[in-house]
Design a protein with these regions (language model features):
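Short glycine-rich substrate-engagement loop in P-loop NTPases that contacts/grips substrate
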Residues: 65-92
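Walker A/P-loop
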Residues: 17-58
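Conserved catalytic/switch belt of AAA+ P-loop NTPases
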Residues: 20, 86-90, 104-135, 141-154
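Loop/turn-to-beta-strand initiation segments
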Residues: 26, 62, 93-100, 131-137, ...
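N-terminal pre-P-loop "Q-motif" helix
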Residues: 4-16
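Low-acidity, Ser/Thr- and Arg-rich intrinsically disordered low-complexity segments
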Residues: 209, 218, 222-223, 229, ...
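Conserved catalytic segments around the Walker B and adjacent sensor/switch elements
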Residues: 27-29, 53-70, 158-161
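Conserved C-terminal "switch" segment of AAA+ ATPases
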Residues: 55-56, 146-157, 161-213
Length: 241
C-alpha cells in the first residue's frame, strides 16, 4: 500500500536475489547516481517477497531498515553507540529470515568512532557479515562508494556491487505510467500520455527527475481554486508572478 511499485529493473532485481541466495558474500550493494532508484530496488524486493515471487531461499524473509541517525542520537558516552548497534545485531541474529537494509551505507564507515579508540559501525558489522550470520543490502552513490566505502577493503569485499544505471527514456515512460494512478489519486487530476512522454524526454535520465517535472504542475492546479466559465483566469508569469 505505502510503497510504490517497482517497474522494470528485472535484470538488477534478479542479480540481487542471486547474491542473497549465496552462502557467503551474500550482501548486495546498489551503487548509482542520485535519483536512479536505489532505494526503490529494496522496496521492490520487499514487495516481491511479500507476493512470494522469489526463490525458496528468500521466502518469508523480512527486510529491516537501519536508522543510523536514530542509533547515534543521544549517545553521550563512549560505548553507547556500540551497545545500541550490538543490540540491533543481536536481535537480527535471532531472526534467520532477516535482511538488514542500510541506505547511504558509506555513512557507517567511521560512524560512532571517537579518538579514544571506540569501534565504528563498520567494524562492528564486519564479523557477522563475514560469517554470513546476517545478510545486508546497502546503497550508495558512485562518488561516496569510491571515496569512503571502497577504501575499507575488509568491509567492501563482503559486498557484491550491483550498479544501478539510468534507465532509457522508454523505460522511464513505463515507470511514470506505472506510478500515474497514485499521483492522479493524490492530486485529483489526470496525467496524459503525452505529458508523461514529454517529462521523460525533458528529464533525459532519471525517473525521479521526470516525476519532479510533472508534480509541480499538478500541485499548482490542485492548490488553486477551480476556474469558472464566467471568471477570467489569471495566468502567472516569471516577470509579474
Amino acid at each position: 500500500g505505502k510503497l510504490d511499485p517497482l517497474i522494470g529493473r528485472e535484470t538488477e532485481l534478479e542479480r540481487t536475489m542471486q547474491v542473497l541466495c549465496r552462502r557467503r558474500k551474500n550482501n548486495p550493494v546498489f551503487v548509482g547516481d542520485p535519483g536512479v532508484g536505489k532505494t526503490a530496488m529494496a522496496e521492490g524486493l520487499a514487495q516481491k517477497i511479500q507476493k512470494k515471487d522469489v526463490p525458496d531461499l528468500l521466502k518469508d524473509i523480512q527486510i529491516f531498515s537501519l536508522d543510523l541517525g536514530g542509533l547515534l542520537a543521544g549517545t553521550k558516552f563512549r560505548g553507547d553507540f556500540e551497545q545500541r548497534l550490538k543490540g540491533v545485531i543481536a536481535e537480527l541474529q535471532k531472526r534467520p529470515k532477516a535482511i538488514l537494509f542500510i541506505d547511504e551505507i558509506h555513512t557507517i564507515v567511521g560512524a560512532g568512532a571517537t579518538s579514544s579508540g571506540s569501534m565504528d559501525a563498520s567494524n562492528i558489522l564486519k564479523p557477522v557479515l563475514a560469517s554470513g550470520e546476517i545478510r545486508c543490502i546497502g546503497s550508495s552513490t558512485f562518488e561516496e562508494f569510491k571515496n569512503h566505502f571502497e577504501k575499507d577493503r575488509a568491509l567492501s569485499r563482503r559486498f557484491e556491487k550491483i550498479e544501478i544505471m539510468e534507465p532509457p527514456v522508454s523505460e522511464t515512460i513505463q515507470i511514470l505510467k506505472g506510478l500515474r494512478s497514485r499521483y492522479e489519486e493524490h492530486h485529483g487530476y489526470v496525467y496524459t500520455d503525452s505529458a508523461l512522454k514529454a517529462a521523460a524526454e525533458l528529464s533525459v535520465k532519471y525517473p525521479i527527475t521526470a516525476l519532479a517535472a510533472t508534480t509541480p504542475a499538478m500541485t499548482a492546479a490542485s492548490s488553486n481554486p477551480p476556474v469558472k466559465s464566467d471568471t477570467p483566469a489569471a495566468i502567472p508569469n516569471r516577470a509579474t508572478g
